[in-house]
């Protein structure tokens, strides 16, 4: 783009030296071979103020110029679908801008030399995800905010294996804090569900938890494994009144009680009747 900007500047200068200045000395339309055409203001033989550029490849620019270069606010639209609306500095895309890429992605934020650089938000058309954070030469770095239609993540950008640790907020008001893989619960973490349940443990995915501790909205305390977020296998249960018991569970239903501890701490085996 720098070489093109220099071309625009030199082309305008050489042509205008021989141009009969007319039309109030302010507006003109001029075509430089098949490369580009310009309509707008000029000063001292160079593009100056507001003008419009049209390129032979279909690209169009409308905005302000200074000393023959794009400078200030402007909109660049290409025939491929790329659209840039924002700041320009000495012919370069630098400042704040709104960009639509030809693949459908969109970006709003700070740019430098045409690259995402600074604070900004990228909307990915394919995944339907939105990435908000700090950018360096088109790459997002540090802590990010990633959101979809159903959840929002805050934490470090996932590595090449999709692993990270952070906070997930869901549309049903559930909140998860812990390890993730591809934005699925994976490893140590805790969940506070919209129903009031609090679950800590080693997560296999969003529904299955090993070595789990769970306290439900009624104050019942569970310790064991969860499948589909329901008690599965051997579980230790403590009731709000202090009574405790051990049992075997299947898909959230108790198959049998193994032992019972009363409020005085005495433990006795539970006999099936």
Model-predicted regions and their roles:
Residues 1-273:
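Glycine/tyrosine- and acidic-biased, solvent-exposed loop/turn segments at the edges of beta-strands
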């Amino acid at each position: 783009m720098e070489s093109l900007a220099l071309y625009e500047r030199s082309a305008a200068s050489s042509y205008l030296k021989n141009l009969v200045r007319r039309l109030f000395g302010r507006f003109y339309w001029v075509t430089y071979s098949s490369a580009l055409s310009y309509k707008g203001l000029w000063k001292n033989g160079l593009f100056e103020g507001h003008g419009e550029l049209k390129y032979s490849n279909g690209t169009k620019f409308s905005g302000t110029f200074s000393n023959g270069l794009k400078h200030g606010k402007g909109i660049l639209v290409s025939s491929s679908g790329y659209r840039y609306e924002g700041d320009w500095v000495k012919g370069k895309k630098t400042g704040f801008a709104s960009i639509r890429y030809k693949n459908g992605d969109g970006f709003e934020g700070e740019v430098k030399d045409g690259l995402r650089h600074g604070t900004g938000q990228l909307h990915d058309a394919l995944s339907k995800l939105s990435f908000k954070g700090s950018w360096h030469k088109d790459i997002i770095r540090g802590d990010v905010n990633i959101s979809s239609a159903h959840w929002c993540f805050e934490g470090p950008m996932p590595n090449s294996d999709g692993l990270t640790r952070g906070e997930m907020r869901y549309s049903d008001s559930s909140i998860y804090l812990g390890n993730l893989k591809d934005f699925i619960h994976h490893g140590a973490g805790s969940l506070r569900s919209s129903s009031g349940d609090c679950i800590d443990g080693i997560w296999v995915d969003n529904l299955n938890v090993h070595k789990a501790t769970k306290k439900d909205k009624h104050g019942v305390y569970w310790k064991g494994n969860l499948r589909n977020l329901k008690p599965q296998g051997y579980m230790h249960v403590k009731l709000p009144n202090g009574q405790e018991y051990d049992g075997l569970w299947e898909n959230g239903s108790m198959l049998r009680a193994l032992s019972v501890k009363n409020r005085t701490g005495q433990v006795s085996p539970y006999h099936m009747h």
